[in-house]
Amino acid sequence: MLILQPTLDMAETWSKDRLAPMVRDTAVLTDLVADAKARDSGNTVLHKRFTGGHVTVAGANSPTSLASRPIRVVLADEVDRYPQSAGAEGDPISLAQKRSDTFFNSVHVTTSTPTIKGVSRVEAEFDLTDQRRWFCACPHCKEYQTLKWEQVSWDKDEDGKHLPETARLICSECNKDISDKQREVMVRQGEWRATAPFEGKRGYHLNGLCSLFPPRKGYKTR
């Protein structure tokens, strides 16, 4: 597996702060992956070997880190922060995915928080998929809907000051208030639904209103 981060520095930080603690705290992984500091482990911060496979963490700005060994699974993370080219070698996502050309069962995953509409990499990738969204049923009218930030409403005091602690979700169909506890139940009981024809690629969109943690003290609009 190749996990591609925006830069090589970010790849090292992600490996130390996210990957290493996960391996350390998950018993089945601890037994499989030797610590990079262990003598003769063969592992480094950016490359972990284990029985049956390996994980390489690379930077999209480093053509060298995108070269060498073949990879079956390519996970490109935070692609909207990638440079347009890995040095002079071209698009880093294409370079990474070419490493899986020899596998009939290759898997490509592209993820990111979207940035600017119209120039976002992940938006362009999502538009090529069946565009699955998380649909939830209103606790009042039972109509399924996707949760949007436009559905968040709040009160103002007599001076026009916003009162964030009064923020609540409004059903897009019946316009009734939905409490945060009701929202959590909605999200837990929701389902993925494709909103475009399937042409070989699955895509998933999920925003912060579907998050189940941390507990909210009002909503922050974005």
Predicted regions and their residues:
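Phosphate/NTP-binding elements of NTP-utilizing enzymes
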Residues: 1-222
